[in-house]
């Protein structure tokens, strides 16, 4: 399964934030069970934030490690224009959704599911995605909430 990881998911790991255990469990499955993708524009932001917190050398090492298990979703001019038309409050999230469409992702994994309600690709938290995989009978709707069916 193809998963686009929102930047906040990668930052969970980089900065060992509270959601990091579930994120690490999900990432451990990437390469074996799932294919992880990152939006092209996320890489620069991740590098900048890691460098700011640590060092340029650590930022490059982190990005190199990241690119060892995640692919990069590249978008085009038309994708950015399309993202402008999606009913999403944050344009950066719309660009994440455009990257998810471009790489053929089935889900966007993020900490802010609510901001992806207008996305053409459903969004889930790492915890919700792992719970869904543990319970295959769970059906996920477009908004990332389990349905009653």
Identify the meaning behind each predicted range.
Residues 32-33, 69, 86, 119:
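Structured helix-beta-strand junction loops
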Residues 2, 98-149:
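Acidic, PIN/NYN-like endoribonuclease modules and their adjacent C-terminal/linker elements
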Residues 35, 71-73, 122:
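Conserved beta-strand segments of alpha/beta enzyme cores
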Residues 37-38, 74, 110:
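Short beta-strand scaffold positions
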Residues 62-87:
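Acidic catalytic patch
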Residues 1-38, 51-58, 133-149:
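Short, well-structured N-terminal submotif of metal-dependent ribonuclease cores
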